[in-house]
Amino acid sequence: MPTTGNYFHLHLVSDSTGETLITVARAVAAQYANVTPVEHVYPLVRSQKQLDRVLDEIEEAPGIVLFTLLEKDLVSRLEAKCQQINIPSLSIIGPVMQLFEAYLGASTAGRVGAQHVLNAEYFARIDALNYTMLHDDGQMVDGLEDADVVLVGVSRTSKTPTSIYLANRGVRTANVPLVPGIPIPHQLEVLKKPLVVSLHATPERLIQVRQNRLLSMGAESGNENYVDKQSVTDEVAYARKLSAKFNWVMLDVTRRSIEETAAAILKLYSDRQRQRLPE
């Protein structure tokens, strides 16, 4: 295998920012823990002159070449050079575009960097992020009705990171903590538009996460109830009781990552939106 020591060169050539390439390449490279990729990222490659400089660098440090180029002349030149020096190359978007063309019966418009045009979707994400940051952890409850999704749950059920993840997908997300002995906001009780999702985890999992949190903060005494099994069990029961009372969707996050939790919520939200469409 053409590697040096325990690493290999990974060349990422893009006619745009290269973000798509980086995401895909790192996701795949992470599956090979015994070797480390040395990334060479070449964004905004849109001319023969720019590509020639890239090819010189690739030849100096041969390795895997991944690319997202739409200009056919550039693609042909890159592939020919890689074949000449006997290194693998692959278009990340080429097979996907071919599939689209075959199904839709239409060819691509060939717009370089089209995925990064500042459009309505981009501004929706910015709006969602602004809303989510302002409505984190029970803040500004008067604006809850303007949310797409409201997350509720006891401490350490990943409400905030999940909210931010959803906001990055353009979903306006608020979150409200559920604390025994503290009444929930009236605004939460009377919500009509938003999807309310109650995040749950087992007491054992919550205790583990909370203990790790205390250790990271250097906290010692004064937090007995926070990690006491009976107290945490009571919190979970309280949250479940409220969820049943207000008919909130309950989602167990005990064994879910943030991404998995967000994906489940996005599906719930999408299903709900479809149900509301006029027939």
From Swiss-Prot:
Keywords assigned by UniProt, alphabetized: Kinase, Nucleotide-binding, Serine/threonine-protein kinase, Transferase
Entry-linked InterPro entries: Kinase-pyrophosphorylase, PPDK_reg
Family note: Belongs to the pyruvate, phosphate/water dikinase regulatory protein family. PDRP subfamily.
Reactions that this protein is recorded to catalyse: N(tele)-phospho-L-histidyl/L-threonyl-[pyruvate, phosphate dikinase] + ADP = N(tele)-phospho-L-histidyl/O-phospho-L-threonyl-[pyruvate, phosphate dikinase] + AMP + H(+); N(tele)-phospho-L-histidyl/O-phospho-L-threonyl-[pyruvate, phosphate dikinase] + phosphate + H(+) = N(tele)-phospho-L-histidyl/L-threonyl-[pyruvate, phosphate dikinase] + diphosphate
Protein name as annotated: Putative pyruvate, phosphate dikinase regulatory protein
Keyword RNA-binding carried by entry: no
Transmembrane segments: none
